[in-house]
């Protein structure tokens, strides 16, 4: 089931939420799941490396999440930038084509998923959406600054706008349902995104998701409430929330977000494991199990979250458990029939 966007960004997101019965399930970790399927991501391009080496694996992971119950799959473009591809020797045109390819792969996965279920006489009755991921400047640097928000001398709004502008345009032109501004580490980059959405006249609903280091501030130390207010004032932002943050912080963060916005709230935490930015590896035995992760879900729903999924180190099993939990929720609306 494909539900098109119309009206304001917030209205579009609310319509998708309603069509799903009151909650939308996001997918889980992409890069870590690609590694689990045999991909070597030891590269500054991270998951975007698979756009070059193994696009079939990206498609497989998208399909795995759809089969697990995800309503939204997020493209393999979080760390894909024109500048990053050019540093690997690609032309600007080739770099833009790779960005487009990230969206095309997700759209293909959706088409395959819907077709397979139609052929099995089990047509999908909920929205299936593609969100084009746009990671921060820090994600491009691949030096851990996406987890600190400290960009040094590069940290000016005009620099960040110039860095992201063409990338945003290319991703939007590829035809996703949403633009996902993910793991936003500082207030300045949020302001840059808002101005770009207006200047580029992007008419695809966007979401802003920040990451928090302590349950109060985003990772730069900027106030989450101030950052949420920036998103709230932008009509092109349809939802706002948190990603890549330990589950234990989410309850308080949702309550903070609700103080300053009525937009739909999205939550997709990581597994709770700690990432060592210098060693570029996850520290073992610092996270929670799928069962513990999912135990938070009903609380987050009561707090006001309506889009829920997982980030780094979560898997299709995590998303399957979230899907089952939400479908058992007493607040779950009856799914509408497809006309």
From Swiss-Prot:
Subunit organization: Monomer.
Cofactor(s) required, per the database record: Zn(2+)
Catalytic activity: S-methyl-L-methionine + L-homocysteine = 2 L-methionine + H(+)
Binding site for Zn(2+): 244, 311-312
NCBIfam families for this protein: PRK09485.1
PANTHER family in the cross-refs: HOMOCYSTEINE S-METHYLTRANSFERASE 3 (PTHR46015:SF11), ZGC:172121 (PTHR46015)
Name of the featured protein: Homocysteine S-methyltransferase 2
Hcy-binding domain residues: 12-326
Gene this protein is translated from: HMT-2
Reported function: Catalyzes methyl transfer from S-methylmethionine (SMM) to adenosyl-L-homocysteine (AdoMet). SMM degradation (by HMT-1, HMT-2, HMT-3 and HMT-4) and biosynthesis (by MMT1) constitute the SMM cycle in plants, which is probably required to achieve short term control of AdoMet level.
GO molecular function, one term: S-methylmethionine-homocysteine S-methyltransferase activity
GO BP, one annotated term: methylation
Alphabetical keyword list: Amino-acid biosynthesis, Metal-binding, Methionine biosynthesis, Methyltransferase, S-adenosyl-L-methionine, Transferase, Zinc
Organism annotation: Zea mays
Stored SUPFAM superfamilies: Homocysteine S-methyltransferase
EC number: 2.1.1.10
């Amino acid at each position: 089931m494909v539900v098109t966007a119309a009206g304001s960004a917030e209205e579009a997101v609310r319509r998708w939420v309603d069509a799903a019965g009151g909650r939308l399930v996001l997918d889980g970790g992409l890069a870590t799941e690609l590694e689990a399927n045999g991909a070597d991501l030891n590269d500054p391009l991270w998951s975007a490396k698979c756009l070059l080496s193994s696009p079939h694996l990206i498609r497989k992971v998208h399909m795995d999440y759809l089969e697990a119950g995800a309503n939204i799959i997020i493209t393999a473009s979080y760390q894909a930038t024109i500048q990053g591809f050019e540093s690997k020797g690609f032309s600007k045109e080739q770099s833009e084509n790779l960005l487009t390819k990230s969206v095309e792969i997700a759209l293909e996965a959706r088409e395959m998923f819907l077709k397979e279920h139609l052929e099995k006489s089990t047509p999908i009755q909920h929205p299936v959406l593609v969100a084009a991921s746009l990671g921060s400047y820090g994600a491009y640097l691949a030096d851990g600054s996406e987890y600190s928000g400290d960009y040094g001398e590069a940290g000016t709004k005009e620099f960040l706008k110039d860095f992201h502008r063409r990338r945003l345009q290319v991703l939007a032109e590829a035809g996703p349902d949403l633009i996902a501004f993910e793991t936003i580490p500082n207030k300045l980059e949020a302001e840059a995104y808002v101005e770009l959405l207006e200047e580029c006249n992007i008419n695809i609903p966007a979401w802003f998701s920040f990451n928090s280091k302590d349950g109060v501030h985003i990772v730069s130390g900027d106030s989450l409430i101030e950052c949420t207010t920036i998103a709230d004032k932008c009509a092109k932002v349809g939802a706002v929330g948190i990603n890549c943050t330990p589950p234990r912080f989410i309850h308080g963060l949702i309550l903070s977000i609700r103080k300053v916005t009525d937009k739909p709230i999205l939550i997709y935490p990581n597994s709770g494991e700690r990432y060592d930015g210098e060693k570029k590896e996850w520290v073992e035995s610092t996270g929670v199990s799928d069962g513990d992760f999912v135990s938070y879900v009903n609380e987050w729903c009561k707090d006001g979250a309506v889009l829920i999924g997982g980030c780094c180190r979560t898997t299709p099993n995590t998303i399957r458990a979230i899907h089952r939990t939400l479908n058992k929720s007493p607040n779950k609306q009856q799914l509408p029939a497809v006309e």
